[in-house]
Amino acid sequence: MSKSASRARLADIIRTRSFGRGEITLASGRKSDFYFNLKPTMLDPEGAALLAELTYETLRDEKVDYVGGLEMGAVPLAGAIAQLSWLKNHPISAFFVRKKPKEHGARLSVEGLAKGESLAGKRCVIVEDVTTTGGSAIKAVEAVKESGAEIVLVLTMVDREEGATEAFAAAGLPFRSLYKASEFLNV
């Protein structure tokens, strides 16, 4: 399937499985009359494969060591990208950032690394399913930077176009999205 055909098919899946209308309170605290819940798309076999394919194509030339983001939205996505990268003989490992470190065990903020493995000096991409203001992704960025990593890109599947671009620019973080909310609202 061509990239444009993959993109169109994924948009159809998102529209069917993950987009809705109706008043909702977003993670940012804002109210909205539409929403995206990408988990049904990320956990659908075809949706996961297409998200991984399109995201991997975006990352392929970035010389990325790791991909991850804030739990819960980044977990299925990072896992799918890691799996596809292995199949493409260009492995990119995955991790996720806890919203709050566990109060028992190793008390880690960043999960998925093997014993003795570190993000120090590694090139990382932060992924997110849906971005509104950028606040959640910036929390993940801060935790990963504390681990000594370099953030090369913040990549979201859907940008709600409500300030994230400006927030990432102000933080000096490159930002891209696979889709803009307006692509689903104007159909």
UniProtKB/Swiss-Prot annotation:
One molecular function GO term is: orotate phosphoribosyltransferase activity
Q: Which GO terms describe its biological process?
A: 'de novo' UMP biosynthetic process; pyrimidine nucleobase biosynthetic process
Source domain of life is: Bacteria
Which of UniProt's keywords are assigned here?
Answer: Glycosyltransferase, Magnesium, Pyrimidine biosynthesis, Transferase
> Which prosthetic group or cofactor does it need?
Mg(2+)
Chain positions recorded as 5-phospho-alpha-D-ribose 1-diphosphate binding sites? 98-99, 102, 104, 128-136
Note the subunit structure: Homodimer.
> What is the purpose of this protein?
Catalyzes the transfer of a ribosyl phosphate group from 5-phosphoribose 1-diphosphate to orotate, leading to the formation of orotidine monophosphate (OMP).
- This protein is called Orotate phosphoribosyltransferase
